[in-house]
Amino acid sequence: MNYPSNPNPSSTDFTEFFKFDDFDDTFEKIMEEIGREDHSSSPTLSWSSSEKLVAAEITSPLQTSLATSPMSFEIGDKDEIKKRKRHKEDPIIHVFKTKSSIDEKVALDDGYKWRKYGKKPITGSPFPRHYHKCSSPDCNVKKKIERDTNNPDYILTTYEGRHNHPSPSVVYCDSDDFDLNSLNNWSFQTANTYSFSHSAPY
DNA sequence: CGGTTTTGACCCGCGC
DNA sequence: GCGCGGGTCAAAACCG
């Protein structure tokens, strides 16, 4: 499969910054790294046009599978994460940005099975937001899909929560005795953008 | 027939 | 409190 290249490539590698459980430090470092002083009012990681902290622009929807996999790490809106922790919710939130020239249906197909359960108009945006829930039993991962108001060429996909099961269509490992719980290290590279890695007791 | 989408109604947290 | 906006429910429609 051939995906278009990122129109705004960056060679920045945040690998060393991403450690579980020290999100605040991580966030500060990223902001320093991309030279963004005023991050408190507009927490955008890599694209200033959005009010959301975007984990990465992706060119392959399958990349989001790993990010919401059972061993994913936290990145997302700082206040939102704190709020979710207060409410004892899984704090994981990812926002991915996809060029809409990629077929929207392809962007939706991230390897997991989803059930759409809502659609709402958003104030200040001419585009509605779509609500989806993972169809796997007892899995509470949700995702929201909306067009970036400031940049309608892009679609923002927000993931919340960690899947309690591997992706039905993505192979993580071809080992026979593969065990999710014993997989403590993983990494993935987004095409032409950032690479993430994770090592945590999961 | 089983699962998904559609859609308006409902719910609820938050700011005033 | 109360109202607004965002999030969810659920019944009916839809679809392979």
From Swiss-Prot:
Subcellular location: Nucleus
Cystine pairings recorded for this chain: none
Signal as UniProt keyword: no
Domain of life where this protein originates: Eukaryota
UniProt cross-references to PROSITE patterns, sorted A to Z: WRKY
Record-level GO cellular component terms: nucleus
SMART domains, sorted: WRKY
Keyword field: DNA-binding, Nucleus, Transcription, Transcription regulation
Major place of residence: nucleus
GO MF annotation terms: DNA-binding transcription factor activity; sequence-specific DNA binding
DNA-binding region: 103-168
InterPro entries reported for this sequence: WRKY_dom, WRKY_dom_sf, WRKY_plant
Function: Transcription factor. Interacts specifically with the W box (5'-(T)TGAC[CT]-3'), a frequently occurring elicitor-responsive cis-acting element.
Family: Belongs to the WRKY group II-c family.
Name by which UniProt lists this protein: Probable WRKY transcription factor 59
Organism name: Arabidopsis thaliana
Gene that encodes the chain: WRKY59
